[in-house]
Every structure is written in structure tokens, then in C-alpha cells.
């Protein structure tokens, strides 16, 4: 589970069900340790996840085969759309899991949802960064899924806007719905101005905290403007 024993195999020959089961079980153990308030076990399991070859394979597959942006490159112009390049990327990512230094993201502008006349910025990391982010997410997300409020639906696995709509409907139809407020707000460039110190403080002793700090400071590269640090 913790070494690239599949490195000489063809990408198509990898036993994906086994690797996905390894990641799923480890996520469940992290979730349970967090629920039980066992921080020491939580951190040890997260370290195991971050060393896991299964986690690397599953993360690379998600980025290079399943994600809609798999053919979109970052500032290095690299993508991995063939089996050999995916296998090479997986071995590279796993070998650099403790030494990788994030690169700036490529900033482009895309139409805003619901108002295509307006554009919003989108940061595109290099493909290796996306794979490392997937690895870190599997270690971190399982912990925070146990911490989040049950009625928080944004950017969470298994949650959607339909879940939020249903919750609002049930609340408004409930016996205590005498005065109901709905706030619709658009926070301009909110993610560009997140307080890094508060975010890092919330991570506590998370094993990949230094890599997350590096991602926050990686900055952006925009056509015609060059490099700009993250605010």
C-alpha cells in the first residue's frame, strides 16, 4: 500500500478496486478517529494516507481520467492523457510526495454561472500539483467531514445544491419558521483574500500543513501580466 509496486505494470492492469478500497477504508478510519476525539490516531492515519501508493494512484486517476479539466494544462503545459504518461506521473508524484514544491497557478477567465456577460477568474494548477492536492485532500477531508456542521453543503463530497434546497424547504415548512431570512451574497474575489494565518491555525498539527502553506503562497501567472503573489 505504501510503495509503487505497480510501477512496472501497465496502467490498464492496475487493480483499481483494491486501491480504491484501501483509500476508502483509510478515510473511514480517519473519520472515526476524529469523531472519537483521538487526535494522535487521527494524525498517524493521515500520515499513512499521505504515504499510501493507493492514495497516489487514485488521485492521479481522478485528475487525469475522471476530471473534466484533465486536458487543461497549468503553466508548464503538461497533461497526462495516455496510459504511459499517467503511470509515469504517478511514480513521479509518489517519489516527490515529501519534497514537492508547488508552482504558481495559471489564471484564466470564464463566464460566471447565471450571468455569462460577466467573467470570473479561475486558477489552473499544474497537473502534478492537482495530483498532490488530491492526495492531501483524502487525508484532510475525512477529518473535516467529521467536524463540519451537518447543514453545511458547499464543496463537500456527497452534497449538492439540491440538498441545500431541501433543507431550506423543510426549515421553511417547519413549526418554528415564523421569521425566515435568506441571504444571497457574492463575495468579490473571496478566495483570493482568505486569511492564511487563520486557515493554517485551523489545520493544527495536520501532517501536510507545510505543503498547504506553500500552495497558499504559490501565486498566479496571468497572460499579459506575469506573476502575482497571492494576497
Map each language-model feature to its residues.
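Conserved polymerase palm-domain catalytic core
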Residues: 147-151, 155-159, 163-231
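Compact soluble domain cores
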Residues: 82-90
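Charged boundary/loop elements
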Residues: 8-69, 138-155
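Short, charge-rich, low-complexity alpha-helical interaction segments
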Residues: 1-4
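Generic recognition of stable, solvent-exposed alpha-helical segments in well-folded globular domains
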Residues: 18-21, 25, 40, 44, ...
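Conformational gate/switch positions in structured elements
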Residues: 38-39, 75, 187
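Reverse-transcriptase-like RNA-dependent polymerase core
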Residues: 62, 91-117, 127, 131-139, ...
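Short, conserved non-catalytic motifs in the polymerase core
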Residues: 67-83, 102-131, 147-160, 182-184, ...
Amino acid at each position: 500500500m505504501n510503495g509503487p509496486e505497480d510501477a512496472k505494470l501497465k496502467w490498464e492492469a492496475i487493480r483499481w478496486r483494491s486501491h480504491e478500497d484501501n483509500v476508502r477504508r483509510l478515510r473511514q478510519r480517519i473519520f472515526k478517529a476524529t469523531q472519537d476525539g483521538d487526535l494522535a490516531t487521527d494524525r498517524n492515519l493521515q500520515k499513512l494516507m499521505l504515504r499510501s501508493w493507493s492514495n497516489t494512484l487514485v488521485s492521479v486517476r481522478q485528475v487525469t481520467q475522471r476530471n473534466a479539466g484533465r486536458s487543461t494544462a497549468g503553466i508548464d503545459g503538461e497533461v497526462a492523457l495516455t496510459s504511459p504518461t499517467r503511470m509515469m506521473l504517478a511514480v513521479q508524484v509518489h517519489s516527490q510526495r515529501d519534497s514537492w514544491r508547488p508552482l504558481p497557478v495559471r489564471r484564466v477567465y470564464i463566464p460566471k454561472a447565471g450571468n455569462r456577460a460577466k467573467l470570473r477568474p479561475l486558477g489552473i494548477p499544474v497537473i502534478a500539483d492537482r495530483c498532490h492536492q488530491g492526495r492531501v485532500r483524502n487525508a484532510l477531508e475525512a477529518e473535516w467531514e467529521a467536524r463540519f456542521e451537518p447543514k453545511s453543503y458547499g464543496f463537500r463530497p456527497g452534497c449538492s445544491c439540491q440538498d441545500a434546497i431541501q433543507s431550506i424547504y423543510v426549515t421553511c415548512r417547519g413549526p418554528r419558521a415564523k421569521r425566515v431570512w435568506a441571504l444571497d451574497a457574492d463575495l468579490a474575489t473571496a478566495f483570493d483574500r482568505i486569511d492564511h494565518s487563520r486557515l493554517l491555525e485551523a489545520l493544527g498539527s495536520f501532517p501536510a500543513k507545510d505543503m498547504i502553506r506553500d500552495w497558499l503562497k504559490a501565486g498566479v501567472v496571468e497572460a499579459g501580466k506575469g506573476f502575482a503573489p497571492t494576497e
